[in-house]
Amino acid sequence: MSMSDPLGDMLTRIRNALARKKGKVVTPASKLRARVLDVLQSEGYIRGYNQVDLGDGKSEIEIELKYFEGLAAIREISRVSKPGRRVYVSAKSIPHVANGLGISILSTPKGVMADYEARKQNVGGELLCRVF
């Protein structure tokens, strides 16, 4: 059975693992997932991730979640643009998350990046998710 929203699946796995206070979570690998995880790691929301080759052309990503004094670094993570309803924004209309305390992750012609980077480079794109 094919998965209709691979990125949404990864975000749900992260959300569920954080609710159960897990240290790591495993998800199937893809380039988009890896780029989103790069942004999450650079912003300090996860400790890191590594890609594990399973052979036969398949691989998984093992994500190390981050906690501080028993609380998850990610309070809320949600998908914005979905397969049935894509959400595109211009550089001037990129929303602020929690008055600037959180970030939006966008897929732009210049790559996957956080909202403030897209504003700085004056580029819009598909609004993938919000993290707070």
From Swiss-Prot:
Organism domain of life: Bacteria
Ribosomal protein found in the keyword field: yes
InterPro entries: Ribosomal_uS8, Ribosomal_uS8_CS, Ribosomal_uS8_sf
GO CC term, one of those recorded: ribosome
Disulfide bonds: none
Keyword Ribonucleoprotein attributed: yes
Coiled-coil stretches noted in the UniProt entry, renumbered to this chain: none
GO biological process: translation
GO molecular function terms listed in the Swiss-Prot or TrEMBL record: rRNA binding; structural constituent of ribosome
Keywords of the record: Ribonucleoprotein, Ribosomal protein, RNA-binding, rRNA-binding
Subunit relationships: Part of the 30S ribosomal subunit. Contacts proteins S5 and S12.
Family assignment from sequence similarity: Belongs to the universal ribosomal protein uS8 family.
Protein role: One of the primary rRNA binding proteins, it binds directly to 16S rRNA central domain where it helps coordinate assembly of the platform of the 30S subunit.
Protein name according to UniProt: Small ribosomal subunit protein uS8
Organism: Bartonella henselae (strain ATCC 49882 / DSM 28221 / CCUG 30454 / Houston 1)
